[in-house]
């Protein structure tokens, strides 16, 4: 800390100002304001961050000493003011906690009660927010013994004012001789760390990470230092290196990583104007700018900054693992067990694998891959001993092109993917210890690569490893209940290692610009060649990487009731083996991208596409389903259900004659029977018919189906979606049919706000039925579009809406494709625009992916003809862009093909 820094705090000038004023408060406030401005300017000008946070602690020391001196403490008063916690370490960010301990010799606080209260009131009045406790030396011992947080705080203390001997007595009575011996302290701190990591989903890669508490954050470094302090009395990284726990290079890496996080935290506090340790979207862009990051052709400044952040915390996590493992071996192990040999290079020691000698990786570099294969083959191995982790770090520079092309290494790497257990766990270890990104440089490029959106909630490398984890979990019984089809298929894949390898490469092309699927396919081809895979295996992996998005896109954006869509997709996959691999990869990809994306409706779409495609392949691609044949089958099966329930077939025939082919193509026989039975029982003047099908019989069946039958009216869609918006329903699919008798038969698939179906909640079902019926009975009372606040996260991912309009070559409709930021009431707004432009909606596919929607609308003009006027299309596009823009930049993307 500085001894004198008059620019930050001029003691003489401050004392003079105190003497001139009747009240000291104004002088203190002025000094605090000035110091804040000086420190902020120093940060912006690039001042060394360590000096900066020490400067702030020094300034607060001076302010507290001056405040303490405002009161009459006798020279021999047994009372002292101590800094504890982070402030005790001499580290203060702009809004860090200023933790104080007022330490007394006697348990009787009464004699000092009044001056202490006046002192704390002064601190409050001058705007210094402190956390304080008042304890005697004995009380420190009592509370420290009972509370891990208290003993941790007391270990980091400095005397600000008053006699130093009180602090020394406090340290003596709270030492390891009296409480919290190093073993007990380490176990408690390690458990505390695990609990904290679990709170942040055990990942360094959260979208809005906590700079202090997330895995790899500042708290992990502090945990290392606390344990070292309890064991050795050292309280900084340099001293820890002196104890042999850190190499010089490791000490330098930890120190530079800590300083980077300090910069981020300082900037966070400065921008937020409060104590804020969450790296929120609100601040990420501005911090990237403050720290000097700029946009490039391939990456935004924020992506470059966040990649740096994730790589830093990953380095901290790696070193934390090493040091904690070292502590565990030194503090906990009795070292009584004998090592059990695994082979000439490795042995098992206390359940952990270790190299048999320090030269193993130097003499046999292939052992850097072998160690992970051995752990996968022996799942009882708990992990890697600290010295061996360090040896891996020291020798990983040997991984060069010769290493990558060595048949021993390529064979071992493929062997890992053939193991029955431990594939994901050991790939994560390889990534954590920096081996994976060196062995596969293309993987190294995606480490810490964040995509700046809400759709992808993990970095590319974390998502990739999560995907492999999901593939592996499909073999677990508890997971197979949620993913029955994917689990069944996974179990019968002829070569499961190929799906893992495809998963490893599916997103590896991201962050380079261009089509990541094509770039990844090129890398996958090179991987197959280098690893001497059979041609068929390589071709399958390359095909999967190149086309890993096709099944999801088809399921969510195409009409799966159209036989031509199924036939085209069946032709694309070619055979059941490719279909099986692609389905399993798609399911794992969606679940590994963002757990909230996987809902019952998306699951049912993929299942339907898989099942229908499999039927088409077994029937033979040369025998596609004829539209008339499908209609005939649906009608026959539906009529059989109705007749068995006592319905007059003549009534059915009369009803069906007005419905048209599309209705029977888009609905199952069961749905046709359900609709027909209700329609035929509906009184002529009964108003709108609203049917709601509950789906709780099968937990993962899909969304809730709402069927509406009523006389057609121009604003029917607009009124319906506005009413559903008011009912807090999320629409995922819409099928709009108008009969020749001018009745509309609309089917909506909806989910609740939690992504589930409505289920067997009679009150909720009745609320929906009543709300829709009332709105459709009184269409003139157009439901008001609810003006909900746009969620904070969505505001930071706003982009200009993109609208593509073209006519369908096979059907007499115009296709309007919308890519836009999500916002409350979006569909209701679209419906209002269609109403204003006198358009009829024939069909819709709705998909919400994170912060964006990807919707497809099939529309016609009022005469049921495709749109043909480019000017009208341009006006329509402008209206949509204007209505849906959310904090987006000016301009939009329009492609019209009429």
From Swiss-Prot:
PROSITE patterns recorded: ACT, HD
Cofactor section: Mg(2+)
UniProt-listed GO biological process terms: regulation of nitrogen utilization
Keyword Glycoprotein found: no
Record text on activity regulation: Uridylyltransferase (UTase) activity is inhibited by glutamine, while glutamine activates uridylyl-removing (UR) activity.
Positions of the HD domain: 460-582
UniProt entry keywords in alphabetical sequence: Hydrolase, Magnesium, Multifunctional enzyme, Nucleotidyltransferase, Repeat, Transferase
EC number: 2.7.7.59, 3.1.4.-
Segments forming domain ACT: 705-783, 815-891
Residue segments, region Uridylyltransferase: 1-341
Record-stated family: Belongs to the GlnD family.
Annotated function: Modifies, by uridylylation and deuridylylation, the PII regulatory proteins (GlnB and homologs), in response to the nitrogen status of the cell that GlnD senses through the glutamine level. Under low glutamine levels, catalyzes the conversion of the PII proteins and UTP to PII-UMP and PPi, while under higher glutamine levels, GlnD hydrolyzes PII-UMP to PII and UMP (deuridylylation). Thus, controls uridylylation state and activity of the PII proteins, and plays an important role in the regulation of nitrogen assimilation and metabolism.
NCBIfam families according to UniProt: PRK00275.1, UTase_glnD
Protein name, per record: Bifunctional uridylyltransferase/uridylyl-removing enzyme
Gene of this entry: glnD
